[in-house]
Amino acid sequence: MALKHFNPTTSGQRQLVIVDRSGLYKGKPVKTLTEGLLSKGGRNNSGKITARFQGGRHKRSYRFIDFKRLKLDVSAKVERLEYDPNRTAFIALIRYEDGQLSYILAPQRLDVGDTVVAGLSVDVKPGNAMPLGNMPVGAIVHNVEMKPGKGGQIARSAGAYAQLVGRDQGMAILRLNSGEQRLVSSNCFATVGAVSNPDHGNINDGKAGRSRWRGKRPHVRGVAMNPVDHPHGGGEGRTSGGRHPVSPWGKPTKGKRTRSNKATDKFIMRSRHQRKK
């Protein structure tokens, strides 16, 4: 879908660039596939702030998305494409041959009326799901499982995809958007195609209020605080903070590596931090 620009009739419209969602369904979601979503505002059960700069967002209902695609060899027709406030991608409502309704992530080039199916050996076309071991090398995929049967975890946000670049001893080699190359079991399911809404990265909110609608409150810089509030606080006049950037609790930030799961290091063939050649 294309981007939508606006005439500068007000200050908030001047810089505004949003995704044109005119092709999406304009009604309410399927009630049996939704549930209420409680807005915490960054507070815990004591009412204390545990996540700063959150709160005041628009009320949402959660849509149940089928990330597992366990209904094998039963074709489904795309009823409509919908907006989902809980994610950056669009979602598709599909109706199986037996009448069951389900939501899936909508890939690019999937239209209303198309047919999708999940199975061990199905056609390589957008929306179809199958094990990585049965896909041709070079295929573009999304919603990739990391453990068989767990449900898709990799490449689920707007415009995201991974590419199957090879196989090795029962494992599939994936190249991710970050540049990382990773081993995943060939039995893991993935869906063909790239995720919808690739223009999401080009939007411009135009005004602070749009961030507030999404629950984002003003993020105060450490150098603007007092010494009691932040390691960068205080000083006469404006200062640079005087040290490498840290969090309010003194932990290094802005580039400090935080990955500590050594058990899965063996599955990373090429780190996303390696210099691009």
From Swiss-Prot:
One of the primary rRNA binding proteins. Required for association of the 30S and 50S subunits to form the 70S ribosome, for tRNA binding and peptide bond formation. It has been suggested to have peptidyltransferase activity; this is somewhat controversial. Makes several contacts with the 16S rRNA in the 70S ribosome. Belongs to the universal ribosomal protein uL2 family. Keywords: Ribonucleoprotein, Ribosomal protein, RNA-binding, rRNA-binding. The gene is rplB1. GO terms for cellular component: large ribosomal subunit. HAMAP family: Ribosomal_uL2_B. PROSITE patterns: RIBOSOMAL_L2. One of its GO terms (molecular function) is rRNA binding. One of its GO terms (biological process) is cytoplasmic translation. The keyword Zinc does not apply. The keyword Transport does not apply. It comes from Bartonella bacilliformis (strain ATCC 35685 / KC583 / Herrer 020/F12,63). Residues 222-277 are annotated as: Disordered. This is Large ribosomal subunit protein uL2. Part of the 50S ribosomal subunit. Forms a bridge to the 30S subunit in the 70S ribosome. Signal peptide: none annotated.
